[in-house]
């Protein structure tokens, strides 16, 4: 008899939910949750499907995740079609197997088992699901959180099912994430002929000392939970394509992944002061993708660590490394936020896969977390 977690994961993987498409995944989840007494509230925005579901009342534990997946790449490089889930050598293959339809299946089955064992559970169990995490992330969790905050919805704990693990399920738990802010800098000069530089003003030449200082700056030293803030230049653009024209404008895009030692406003101030010292003529636009968040300790971290230890006999590392996740939006509700999911070695790659046994373990861990917090 096939494991219910694997069976549900396969149903979800069959749906080609390329972001922000949901392709019917949420309807499968909604039917399962409604069958065990959850109230379902669709919260759709633009081209994005979201839902908020809950059962019970009081102290609230939510499970969060996304049904959308990234593009498959060249399908001829896959050993089996990416939307035809296949099990080989104990591994479940398919786009979204690890990121994160396997986690979604583990969550749903954990909820079914939990409700069967604790039909009158004392707290509230909730689900926050979106189809817009992998692409723009503009009409997904961020909009749901805004709506929930506007009506003062309670959220105490949130478990995000992102693939956090490295070598074996549960070895890494993300108890926070760095913030992310991107600068779009345009340095203005005067276009001209390269043979007559005195009649032009080359913005690339003017910018180099400032960019050198930008790269050499140590923005902070990090702290016990976060590595030092990282600044990386991502894109440069100047010139007309001709070898005899001095460019009139120089575009530089750079990104900060910042710790709780900094704020976005402090980064903006320091960058502006640096550019002004170099007397540049510039315009600067900022895009804040997310603030850093940290769940240093508390009931949720304890419950997650206990659940992992119970089923694997390993003590997970608590880390804040990696990119951003929807946890950055959920943390704004004041909730404790932790990420626990399968091994991330193949996410976004050709032949994405996850251990079938790991998904079964993960579902048991999720159930154990529910039992510790809201049973």
From Swiss-Prot:
Its EC number is 3.5.1.18. Zn(2+) 2 binds at residues 99, 134, 348. GO terms for biological process: diaminopimelate biosynthetic process; L-arginine biosynthetic process; lysine biosynthetic process via diaminopimelate. Pfam families: M20_dimer, Peptidase_M20. The keyword Ion transport does not apply. Binds 2 Zn(2+) or Co(2+) ions per subunit. Its cofactor is Zn(2+); Co(2+). Keywords: Amino-acid biosynthesis, Cobalt, Diaminopimelate biosynthesis, Hydrolase, Lysine biosynthesis, Metal-binding, Zinc. Zn(2+) 1 binds at residues 66, 99, 162. It catalyses: N-succinyl-(2S,6S)-2,6-diaminopimelate + H2O = (2S,6S)-2,6-diaminopimelate + succinate. One of its GO terms (molecular function) is cobalt ion binding. Pathway: Amino-acid biosynthesis; L-lysine biosynthesis via DAP pathway; LL-2,6-diaminopimelate from (S)-tetrahydrodipicolinate (succinylase route): step 3/3. The keyword NAD does not apply. InterPro entries: ArgE/DapE_CS, Bact_exopeptidase_dim_dom, DapE_proteobac, Peptidase_M20, Peptidase_M20_dimer, Peptidase_M20A. Belongs to the peptidase M20A family. DapE subfamily. Homodimer. Catalyzes the hydrolysis of N-succinyl-L,L-diaminopimelic acid (SDAP), forming succinate and LL-2,6-diaminopimelate (DAP), an intermediate involved in the bacterial biosynthesis of lysine and meso-diaminopimelic acid, an essential component of bacterial cell walls. This is Succinyl-diaminopimelate desuccinylase. It comes from Yersinia pestis (strain Pestoides F). The lineage of its organism: Bacteria, Pseudomonadati, Pseudomonadota, Gammaproteobacteria, Enterobacterales.
């Amino acid at each position: 008899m096939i494991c219910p977690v694997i069976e549900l994961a396969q149903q979800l993987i069959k749906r080609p939910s390329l972001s922000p498409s949901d392709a019917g995944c949420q309807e499968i989840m909604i039917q399962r949750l409604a069958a065990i007494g959850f109230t379902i509230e669709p919260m759709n925005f633009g081209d994005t499907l979201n839902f908020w579901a809950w059962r019970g009342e009081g102290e609230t534990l939510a499970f969060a995740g996304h049904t959308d997946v990234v593009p498959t790449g060249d399908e001829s490089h896959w050993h089996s079609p990416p939307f035809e889930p296949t099990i080989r050598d104990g591994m479940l293959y398919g786009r979204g197997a690890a990121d994160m339809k396997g986690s979604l299946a583990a969550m749903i089955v954990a909820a079914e088992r939990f409700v069967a064992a604790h039909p009158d559970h004392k707290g509230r169990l909730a689900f926050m699901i979106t189809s817009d995490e992998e692409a723009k992330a503009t009409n997904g969790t961020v909009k749901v959180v805004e709506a929930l905050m506007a009506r003062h919805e309670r959220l105490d704990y949130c478990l995000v099912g992102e693939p956090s693990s490295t070598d074996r399920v549960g070895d890494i738990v993300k108890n926070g994430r760095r913030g992310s802010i991107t600068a779009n800098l345009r340095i203005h000069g005067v276009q001209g002929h390269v043979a007559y530089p005195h009649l032009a003003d080359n913005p690339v030449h003017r910018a180099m000392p400032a960019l050198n200082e930008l790269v050499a700056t140590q923005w902070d030293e990090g702290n016990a939970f976060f590595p030092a803030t990282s600044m990386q230049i991502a894109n440069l653009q100047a010139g007309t394509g001709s070898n005899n024209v001095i460019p009139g404008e120089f575009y530089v895009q750079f990104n900060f992944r910042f710790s709780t030692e900094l704020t976005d406003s402090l980064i903006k101030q320091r960058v502006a002061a640096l550019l002004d010292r170099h007397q540049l003529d510039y315009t600067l636009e900022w895009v804040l993708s997310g603030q850093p968040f940290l769940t240093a300790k508390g009931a949720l971290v304890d419950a997650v660590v206990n659940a992992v230890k119970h089923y694997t006999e390993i003590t997970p590392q608590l880390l804040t490394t990696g990119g951003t996740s929807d946890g950055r939006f959920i943390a704004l509700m004041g909730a404790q936020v932790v990420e626990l999911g399968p091994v991330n070695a193949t996410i976004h790659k050709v032949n994405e896969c996850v251990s079938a046994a790991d998904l079964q373990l993960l579902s048991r861990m999720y159930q154990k977390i529910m039992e510790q917090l809201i049973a």
